[in-house]
Every structure is written in C-alpha cells, then in structure tokens.
Amino acid sequence: MMIDMFTGLKRSHRGGDLRIDHAGQTVTLMGWVQRRRDHGGLIFVDLRDRSGLVQVVFSPEVGKEAFTKAEDVRNEYVLAVTGDVRPRPEGTVNANLPSGQIDVYARQLWVLNSAKTPPFYIEDGVDVDETVRLKYRYLDLRRPEMQRNLIIRHKTAKAMRDFLDRNGFLEIETPMLTKSTPEGAREFMVPSRIHPGEFFVLPQSPQLYKQILMVAGMERYFQIVRCFRDEDLRADRQPEFTQLDIEMSFTQMDDLLTLMEEMVAHIFKEALGKEISTPFRRIPYAEAMGRFGSDKPDLRFGLELIDLTETVKDVEFKVFASVVKGGGEVKAINAKGCAHFSRKEIDDLTKGVAVYGAKGLAYIQMTEEGPKSPIAKFFTDEQLNAVLDRLGAEKGDLLLFVADKPSVVAASLGFLRQELARRLNLIDSEKLEFAWVVDFPLVEYDPEEKRYNAIHHPFTAPKDEDLDLLDKEPGKVRAKAYDLVLNGVELGGGSLRIYRRDIQEKMFAILGLTAEEAYQKFGFLLDAFDYGTPPHGGIAFGLDRMIMLMTGRDTIRDVIAFPKTQSASDMMVDAPSAVTPRQLKELHIKLDLPVKAPKAEPAKK
C-alpha cells in the first residue's frame, strides 16, 4: 500500500471528543485503526486516539477515492481522515461510547503508516502473558486502561506540584551520582572513569541532600525524584522507582501531618474526583501491632486480634501455659460465622501461619451443640467461658489462636486477618481508609549482628521524653516517625530529624559505628550541623504505589510506562546487556563472573 505524506495536514479535533453538538461540522481526525468492518457498500472504521474511539464511515457516494483506499486498511494502520460529522440513524446510537451519537463520513483519507499484525489485541481486558506485554510495551500502552493509568499519574504529579507550590515549597533537584553509604539496601554502583577504582552510587533517596538543603536555609523543599535499590523484586517494588520527597524547616509533627493530609485530599480530588475526609486517624505503632498484627493495618474490616495472655495463663493446655510462662503471648481472632469451616480449610490456614513462624493454629468451633475443639478438654468450664466472653463468641463463630513470642503472633495473625477478610469478601474495594501510624520504635536489636538497627533510618529523631533512654535502653526509645497507610499499604513515611551533632553522633554509636566510621560516611552532614541547623522534618511518598492504589491495579508495573520485570530486566530494550571489552578497559574493570553449572546430560536408556 502507498503511504501518504504528512505534509500540510492538521488535526482539527480528537475523535473521542466528538459529540452530537459537532453535527454538521467538517473535521480532520488522526489516529489508529482499532477495527475495520466491510459491509459491502460501506466500510466502517473505529478510529482510536488518546481521547477514545469514533466511528468513521467510508461511502463511495461521499468520498470515492477514500472508500477505495479504505479497502486496504488494516488494524493499527495510522490514518488521517477529513469528513463530515453526522448524527447516527435512529436505532444505531451506541450508548456505551461517548462519541456514540455521531459518525464521521470520510471525504478524504491519508494512510500515514501501515502496521504488522500485533501479537495481541489492542483492547482492555486482553488475556496475554505479561512478558509479551512488556516486550511490546509500545503496543500495550496503546490500550485505553494503560493510558488512563498514565493520565492519572500525570494528574497526580501535577496536583502535587500545584499544592506544594501554593504552600511555599521549592522544587530543587539533587544529584543522581552520589556517595555510597552501605547501611541500607544494596546500591547500584557507577564506576568513575576519571577516578579509577572509585564509584558513585545511584541514590536510594535524597535523604541527606534534603537535610543539607534545610541547613542551607531553603526551608521548604520538594522534588518528584527517581530512586534506586538493587534488591529482590515484588509486586510493589522496582529497581528504579519514583517518590515525592518533601522536607520542611521549623515544623512540628502535627503541622506537617495536617499539611500532608490536605495535600493527599487535594490529589484525590484533582486526579480522581474523589472527596477525602480529614483528619486521618492516628494509631500508635504498639496499638497497630497489637490490634491488627501489622504496622500497615487495613482498616476496611474488623477481625481484630484479641489478647488472651492473662485469660489463659493458668490453663492446663501446655502450649498456652508454657508460652505465657516464657514471656510470650496468646492472641486470637473471632472469625464470625465461620464455624462451618472444614478441617481442610483450617489446615490450609495453619499452613499459612506456619510461614510466619507459628508452630500451630488452635481453634474452637462454636457449633449448635456448643464449643467444639481438640483443646477444649484442657479448660475448666470457667476458663473456657472466660475465653468465649473475651472473644464475644456466638454460635456459628470460629475462634483461631496463636501462641508464641509477640513478633510471631503479630505476623501470623496479621496474615490470618487478611486471608480471612479475602475469603469472606469483607474488603470493600471502593473504600479508602487512611491512617497515620506513629510512635515507632527508634531502633531494634539484631541478635545475630549483636547491634541495633534503625527502624527507619539513622537520621530519625527520638521523642523528647525518651531522650534519657538513649544511653541506657535504646530499644525502648520511640521515634518521631510516622507512616501514612491506605488500605493496608504504606503510601509514605517520614520523621522529624535529628538536627544536633551530639545526638546524631550518639545515634551512630548506638548503631555500632565508631566515630571514625561515622565521620568517613557522614562527615559532611556532621560538619553541616556545626553551622546552625534548624529543626526540620519531612516525608517521602511512593508515587508508583500511590498510583497503583488509585487505579485499582495489582502491580506497580501497570502504572509505570517502562517497568522492569520481576527479574530486574527490561524486555523491550533487552537490558541489562553486556558491554564491550573496550568499555570495561576504560573503567579499569575486569569481570569475575560466576561459573555456570553444566547442563545435565540426558539419562541413558
């Protein structure tokens, strides 16, 4: 087919924007062929552009040459069409299509490009392997649902910028090539040609630079920034990801959280047209772990964890009694109306909690005949009634117990809570439940490393009332830290920062760094603290995760234009890839690659 020149052509309208009000106008449209139907005397083409679809009718009576050319048009050809907008005949209106009240009768047709047959249909809900979608990402992104995701991403970023600009924040870029501080996740390293044997790293976050900007008197900073972590991937992780990074000087925690609530409400209104009520509830970390078994609680449903440690401490059931005696705890969930669960279903749940360290899952079924359970014989009537009262048990309920150290109980029942909610269809996908989780521990002890690790990062300030515990019992110190959670997913996290050199040096010492190590890694920050550092704090929001929740997707790969696979590769451009020996030589790098295991020989018959 002859390809027409684009010279002089100008689009007048987007096809998906045409309505009955445009009837009688002559328009020039441009887009892709979604579908072509030949009805003998007429040819119908659904023309697609970013705005949607419009039906173009080719009739030899209106445009003979255009009709002839349309006979050779196929799916995904790129067309320009000039034609007349006409109301559709009665009975042919398509109420499911925004432009469904009109057709465009083509006078002229230009074929701007042809196309091979795509490896999958360019339409929503297409059932195709994700690796194929990622390899042909330029086709996948033509699908309306994928374009909607990126449009919402754009609107979200714009809403963020508009809100922060109105509130006195400056958008300031920080370096992409920076210094290695190997305390957190594994870093991507960039060799320096000019400084042989030395490396930059790609930043995991702009944390230190934004604090330096506060020292520099910028007062209110933000940027929408790309960050990098060389870690194993999950559905909500990528080696490169985007976050909204914010820092403020002279702010109290309440002021910062209130401003962020206003920003989130603004984002959801501008990008989705949804009204979000504020303020968000605030839940202390200990309460979140105690009631929901998670520091990212999904508040769209109940199924709260009930502490029975005191209630069962004297029962004859050795599993419970020994755990309580050893300083552990016993907690349970009342799964309302689930007494009918089969033994297999309970066994499946038992296997589920075992992944989180639970050694078993005790249960009581509240049947018509009364409580039924392998453990009931170890309880006196008084003890059993006390447990049932504590759990609010009624006929038809299923009571599920885990006894272990607190971390295992929380993780196991936290999983069980989510799994039961999923099985019982308790999760309202339309509901938005925001919460701030606050008062995190500042550090946690690692018995293997025999040292403390920062829960958030080493620059998080301890609560003023806990400062005296820093020297004696750092594990009991609470942090001025906060995470914003939406429907069980962490949207963002931050803290008020340490802004005094003496406290920052003490924090490094608690984390096991010598004074020399601390200065080698963070000397520039410590030196900056000598020159009048203001009190400051900030937060970072994961933009990819936020868009994933806003669009109802299951993976952030659906809201990133060109994501990596779960094996950290780019299927479309085939990256990462080998480089030439010359490139390696320029960087003074020699490869020491792992030896590939030999392929097993087929067994001899």
UniProtKB/Swiss-Prot annotation:
GO molecular function, one term: transferase activity
Top-level division of the source organism's lineage: Bacteria
Signal peptide (from-to): none
Catalytic reaction annotation: tRNA(Asx) + L-aspartate + ATP = L-aspartyl-tRNA(Asx) + AMP + diphosphate
UniProt keyword annotation of Acetylation present: no
Record HAMAP family: Asp_tRNA_synth_type1 (MF_00044)
Function: Aspartyl-tRNA synthetase with relaxed tRNA specificity since it is able to aspartylate not only its cognate tRNA(Asp) but also tRNA(Asn). Reaction proceeds in two steps: L-aspartate is first activated by ATP to form Asp-AMP and then transferred to the acceptor end of tRNA(Asp/Asn).
Protein name: Aspartate--tRNA(Asp/Asn) ligase
Species annotation: Heliobacterium modesticaldum (strain ATCC 51547 / Ice1)
Primary gene name: aspS
